[in-house]
Amino acid sequence: MNIAGNLYLPKDMDKSKKHAAIIVGHPMGAVKEQSADLYAVKMAERGFVTMSVDLAFWGGSDGQPRNAVAPELYAETFSAAVDYLGTGPFADREKIGAIGICGSGSFAISAAKIDPRLKAVATISMYDMGAANRNGLNHSLTLAQRKQIIADAAEQRNVEFQGGATKYTSGTVHEITEKSTPIERE
């Protein structure tokens, strides 16, 4: 799977040396050209080699279905960026870190837990998307509801394996009611 990224180099960089590098991941539901590029540019202005990335399934990166929610593959996006930077001419492979914005904060941390090549992680307005997907926003799903979601997903796998229609979830409520949370109303 190809991962799209924008590479930024410090102005007046000594190209005969390797430099510390930072990978910047965008918020959930965004693309690199939004806030991730801004952070990448600003960190390049401070002397870092930087790369903003589109998470797998988003923006210019490969992956179907588009805009899928796959936290384990999002963590892999950061490792793929380490592969690229660490084998290129500008980045010191022993000095590569990550900045994760919003949902990418949790994906960067997940990547660093399993990829020791990521030497530092910083988060900006981090939101744990994995926990939100497992437990609902603000832990709003009961254990029984979570078990039902898993059972429904298992049954849907059977349906799709046997040629049935793919079922997608929107990730958002379909109707605003008096019981809707402020986040749902937003």
PLM feature segments, named:
Residues 19, 26-31, 102:
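Active-site glycine-rich loops that stabilize anionic/oxyanionic intermediates
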Residues 24-27, 52:
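Structural cue for short, hydrophobic secondary-structure segments
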Residues 35, 68-89:
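Alpha/beta-hydrolase active-site loop
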Residues 42-62:
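Conserved alpha/beta-hydrolase
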Residues 89-102:
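Alpha/beta-hydrolase fold nucleophile elbow
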Residues 107-186:
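Alpha/beta-hydrolase-fold enzymes
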